[in-house]
Amino acid sequence: MPTKIAVYPGSFDPITYGHLDIIDRALRIFDQVIVAVARNSAKSALFTTDERVDMIQRVLADNVRARVDTFDGLLIDYVLSQKATVIIRGLRAISDFEYEFQIAQMNRSISQDVETLFMMTSVPYGYLSSSIVKEVSSLNGPIDGLVPPLVRQALRDKFAGPDR
């Protein structure tokens, strides 16, 4: 039986428990999930690509069916190069859906061999985003329930200034 491979793309700047929830749930459906970190994201990143990959690899170290990789260029080209058939996208709100729907339609127009699977975030993570985590952390707020401990420490290190 062929291996069912899905790609979960994103900037993951940084990875949160919301992302990890989607990965865990996707692994219930697929044999392998590739967490694909965007190298040339339009977003301005706090962490370098290498730092993001390292954090994700460390967080997922015990899961042999999750693999971390990077990509640039068109996502659909990367997905096809990995012999994956599904793109996983997490949705928090209807506003996420409108944008993601447009991207999914564009990907579908390029290749009908790849489907996009939208997964609603679990209730505790419905509001969670990397941007919120970075903002709260930059203001020295509590992020314990939002990111794994090693990510929390990396954020503290990034935001530690001479006056902290």
Curated annotation (Swiss-Prot):
Q: Which residues bind substrate?
A: 11, 43, 75, 89
Top EC class of this enzyme: transferase
Domain of life, per UniProt, equals Bacteria
Q: Look up keyword Cytoplasm and say if it applies.
A: yes
E.C. number, please?
2.7.7.3
Alphabetical list of InterPro entries matching this protein: Cyt_trans-like (IPR004821), PPAT (IPR001980), Rossmann-like_a/b/a_fold (IPR014729)
Residues engaged in binding ATP: 11-12, 19, 90-92, 100, 125-131
Kindly state one GO CC term assigned in the UniProt record.
cytoplasm
Gene Ontology biological process:
coenzyme A biosynthetic process
Q: Which cofactor does it need?
A: Mg(2+)
Task: Cite the record's note on assembly.
Answer: Homohexamer.
Outline what the protein does. Reversibly transfers an adenylyl group from ATP to 4'-phosphopantetheine, yielding dephospho-CoA (dPCoA) and pyrophosphate.
Q: What name is this protein filed under?
A: Phosphopantetheine adenylyltransferase
Organism for this UniProt entry: Geobacter sulfurreducens (strain ATCC 51573 / DSM 12127 / PCA)
Taxonomic lineage is: Bacteria, Pseudomonadati, Thermodesulfobacteriota, Desulfuromonadia, Geobacterales
